[in-house]
Swiss-Prot record:
The keyword ATP-binding applies. ATP binds at K20, R21, E26, N27, V28, S29, F30, D31, K32, T71, D75. NCBIfam families: NrdE_NrdA. It catalyses: a 2'-deoxyribonucleoside 5'-diphosphate + [thioredoxin]-disulfide + H2O = a ribonucleoside 5'-diphosphate + [thioredoxin]-dithiol. Heterodimer of a large and a small subunit. It comes from Dictyostelium discoideum (Social amoeba). The record marks Y765, Y766 as: Important for electron transfer. One of its GO terms (molecular function) is ATP binding. This is Ribonucleoside-diphosphate reductase large subunit. Pfam families: ATP-cone (PF03477), Ribonuc_red_lgC (PF02867), Ribonuc_red_lgN (PF00317). Provides the precursors necessary for DNA synthesis. Catalyzes the biosynthesis of deoxyribonucleotides from the corresponding ribonucleotides. It is found in: Cytoplasm. GDP binds at S235, N446, E450, T632, A633, S634, T635. The lineage of its organism: Eukaryota, Amoebozoa, Evosea, Eumycetozoa, Dictyostelia.
Length: 870
């Protein structure tokens, strides 16, 4: 443990001793270890003394001690011991965090001023040159206002993080000098707040207070870089190829490298790059097409990581399905095939038009073109795009190939089943329902598919992000004495959303831009992106099953409140500072807001008529775009919430940190089962055996089974409906994952067409599937393990959940026979027994049962049909 849990008098004959921070040796004292743990248990809020046993924790710690263990190592051992016991009760997880935080506090200064000074005066030991970790501006502000800033920092709030949230901060977010952490979490939050607001001390302090209360969080690049010498605080960059030439391609490549170096994720539109075998006038040669070029981008993403090794570089590449290289494009991430035709470190997305979806549905023809020979397709959308496509399609000898649209469609499905990609976004919906439609045709989204912004060769779109911790807005119902009776505080959400809007707007002006084109775009259009995390936790707290009518209603109400608040704040900023440069001509300037573009009427909770009038006649807006629910992969782990707007994927899972793997139980479920008196190691093992589900476990009440459904037990139609419902109040888009346990082409087709017809902009971010056999199983009791069922794949505590890789087998591989084309339906090569197994599995998957058969396509109803599943 730490120094005050060690005997004061050294004893050379002692079998166990520790090495203190000053190098001296002292005996291990069981009593003092116990006393130290007891002290941390008694901190407010006190841990449940009937559950948490300091003596047992101390016994386990002592059993792992070795002679010469360092006090910091002893603390880490104690924290890990408590974390392993968190499946008994969440309070053990809190204890683990308290031990870890206490350990960090003993290794770092409690003075923010001293910490900043140390970072500013850091000298690189290898070069012997000054290498400040914080900016001169931050240093001068802290030196000038140090006493005031110190007075508002509440270090006690460091203890509010759970063990895994704290470990995520410790691993990547807190500043280090020579490998040793020098920041506390509260130091980081104050650094970020001052980095955003500078000399505006009151705004900085208010931001710090709200961040430390865990009401919201800024995005990872902001937490990384705010207050540093190069404060690149933006998350998302959207790049368009400068031009289809060597100069244009390599200029774009350099831009991507500079952005990635500064911790930005990138979306690249490559529609304008000529297809393979296209004529090159300058050399009288032919083009190699997209694949060799993208392999160069792939190597750049690998080489130039984000923030100096904190995160890998990440590029998403967007292509429209009329491009002649589209078949090679969608295969680039596959695990099999020629290596020179693969670029697996990039992410791939299709920018899909309505006319393509219609042709697939009708089993019609689809023409593929080279953009050099059929110009303008990437620069148009909706009816203009349709007219141009039809014109080119009817031009003799212009199409490179004419295929059946379903041939390309099923190649897309095959790639999605194997790799989880390509992402699917609907080009016409993205353009038709954008407040930037006055600027021109939007040609791509970003890395995570939630940012929809205009780009051009001279403008790289940028977006600054933050997410709201929704569980913090659930409170006890006013007037009720029942602590379980909850309500959602929309007024408080309104106030915090306004604060976030102001913060993100300030970042636009104070940000460091790695390339000039990004600064040009961001200052002209001033878009921001506000997201959410913990929606599933809100529903559980309010005792609303995720697929209930009440949850569907609250889902829309939350989205409406956030949109109204962000618009209100942006309008108030416009009154003070003026509208953004390109406001004139935008839909908002004409009184058309996002829900109008969806033909949705908002509720009467907020005064929309007054707000519209204010925007049109009394000041406009400061920001062109405002709402963009993102994945929140890392930041939701820091704050201890479920990701973004998604249901839980499992009620029990494994989380890996540097110290090892830990079993995690949904803490709210655990508390409910403990209250009923039915939580036990046997119950835990039953949940493990059921792969994180409680639906088949006897003794658990039906209302809890409804409340704790996992995403695999919720109909995919419900998730799409909820995405569309809140979509009317999302002026960018949302990182919408699709969950199908055992995907078939029929299920995927049904899901995609349902999403498209519901009007979603992002039809699919990742396809999340469930492996038939999971890679890692927990140990279960022999009685339970007689009929073992593996649990969910491990989730790394600092990275998003990865889609399990699936290699096509005989049940989902397309035949390579020349006769197997889309003039007649493609067949699975499956046996009758395999087909029966698939049908049985299909019936078992509740989340797909109403989407499994799509009869909108032309189909002969032949045995093994991919479309209808017959």
């Amino acid at each position: 443990m730490i120094s005050n849990s060690i005997n004061v008098t050294p004893n050379k004959e002692s079998k166990m001793y520790v090495v203190k921070r000053d190098g001296t040796k002292e005996n291990v004292s069981f009593d003092k270890i116990t006393s130290r743990i007891s002290f941390l248990c008694e901190m407010e809020p006190k841990l449940n003394s009937d559950i948490v046993d300091p003596i047992e924790v101390a016994q386990k710690v002592v059993s792992g001690v070795f002679p010469g263990v360092k006090t910091t190592e002893l603390d880490n051992l104690a924290a890990e011991t408590a974390a392993y016991m968190s499946t008994r009760h969440p309070d053990y997880g809190i204890l683990a965090a308290r031990i870890s935080v206490s350990n960090l506090h003993k290794q770092t200064s409690k003075s923010f001023v001293e910490t900043v000074k140390k970072q500013y005066e850091f000298i690189n030991p290898k070069s012997n040159l000054l290498a400040p970790l914080v900016s001169k501006e931050l240093y001068e502000i802290v030196m000038k206002h140090g006493e005031r800033l110190e007075s508002v920092i509440d270090y006690y709030r460091d203890f509010d993080y759970d063990f895994f949230g704290f470990k995520t901060l410790e691993r990547s977010y807190l500043h280090r000098i020579n490998g040793k952490i020098v920041e506390r979490p509260q130091h980081m939050l104050m650094r970020v707040s001052i980095g955003i607001h500078g000399e505006d001390l009151e705004s900085a302090i208010n931001t710090y207070k709200r961040l430390s209360e865990k009401l919201f969080t800024h995005a990872t690049p902001t937490l990384f870089n705010a207050g540093t010498p190069s404060p690149q605080m933006s998350s998302c960059f959207l790049v368009q190829m400068k031009e289809d030439s060597i100069d244009g391609i390599y200029d774009t490549l350099k831009q991507c490298a500079l952005i990635s170096k500064s911790a930005g994720g990138i979306g690249i539109a490559v529609h304008k790059i000529r297809a393979a075998q296209s004529y090159i006038r300058g050399t009288n040669g032919t083009s190699n097409g997209l694949v060799p070029m993208l392999r160069v981008f792939n190597d750049t993403a690998r080489y130039v990581d984000q923030g100096g090794g904190k995160r890998k570089g990440a590029f998403a590449v967007y292509l429209e399905p009329w491009h002649a290289d589209v078949f090679e494009f969608i295969d680039l991430k596959k695990n099999t095939g020629k290596e020179e035709m693969r670029a697996r470190d990039l992410f791939y997305a299709l920018w899909v038009s309505d006319i393509f979806m219609e042709r697939v549905e009708q089993n019609g023809d689809w023409a593929l073109f080279c953009p050099n020979e059929a110009p303008g397709l990437a620069e148009t959308h909706s009816e203009e795009h349709r007219a141009l496509y039809l014109k080119y399609e009817a031009t003799p000898d212009l199409p490179r190939r004419v295929i059946k649209a379903q041939e390309l469609w099923f190649a897309i499905m095959e790639s999605q089943v194997e790799t989880g990609t390509p992402f699917i976004l609907y080009k016409d919906a993205c353009n038709a329902k954008s407040n930037q439609k006055n600027l021109g045709t939007i040609s791509s989204s970003n890395l995570c598919t939630e940012i929809i912004q205009y780009t051009s060769p001279d403008e790289i779109a940028v977006c600054n992000l933050a997410s709201i911790a929704l569980p913090k807005f659930v409170r006890q119902k006013v007037g009720s004495t029942d602590p379980k009776e909850k309500e959602f505080d929309h007024q408080f959400l309104f106030e915090i959303t306004k604060l976030i809007t102001v913060n993100l707007n300030v970042i636009i002006d104070r940000n460091y831009y790695p390339v000039a084109e990004a600064k040009t775009s961001n200052l002209r259009h001033r878009p921001i992106g506000i997201g959410i995390q913990g929606l599933a936790d809100v529903f559980i707290k309010m005792r609303m099953p995720f697929d209930s009518v009440a949850a569907a209603k609250l889902n829309v109400e939350i989205a409406e409140t956030i949109y109204f608040a962000a618009l209100t704040a942006s309008h108030e900023l416009a009154i003070r500072d003026g509208t953004y440069e390109s406001f004139k001509g935008s839909p908002a300037s004409k009184g058309i807001l996002q829900f109008d573009m969806w033909n949705v009427t908002p509720s009467s909770r907020w005064n929309w008529a007054e707000l519209k009038d204010n925007i049109v006649n009394k000041g406009g807006l400061r920001n062109s775009l405002l709402i963009a629910p993102m994945p929140t992969a890392s930041t939701s782990q820091i704050l201890g919430n479920n990701e973004c707007f998604e249901p839980y994927t499992s009620n029990i899972y494994s989380r890996r940190v540097l110290a090892g793997e830990f079993t995690i139980v949904n803490k709210q479920l655990l508390e409910d089962l403990m209250e009923l008196g039915i939580w036990s190691p046997e119950m835990k093992n039953q949940i493990v055996a059921a792969r994180g589900s409680i639906q088949s476990i006897g003794g658990i009440p039906d209302d809890l089974k409804e409340l704790y459904k996992t995403v695999w037990e919720i109909r995919q139609r419900t998730l799409i409906d909820m995405a569309a419902d809140r979509g009317a109040f999302i002026d960018q888009s949302q990182s919408f994952n699709v969950f199908i346990a055992e995907p078939t082409f029929a299920k995927l087709t049904s899901m995609h067409f349902y999403s498209w017809k519901k009007g979603l902009k992002t039809g699919m971010y990742y396809l999340r599937t469930r492996p038939a056999a999971d890679a890692i199983q927990f140990t279960v009791d022999p009685i339970v393990s007689q009929t073992p069922k593996p649990v969910e794949n491990n989730i790394n505590s600092t990275t998003p959940l990865k889609t399990p890789t699936k290699t096509p087998n005989s049940s989902n591989r397309i035949s390579t026979s020349p006769t197997n084309n889309l003039t007649s339906p493609i067949r699975f090569n499956i046996t009758q027994q395999q087909q029966q197994q698939q049908q049985q599995q299909q019936q078992q998957n509740n989340n797909e049962d109403d989407l499994a058969n799509y009869d909108g396509m032309t189909c002969r109803r032949e045995e093994g049909c991919l479309v209808c599943g017959s």
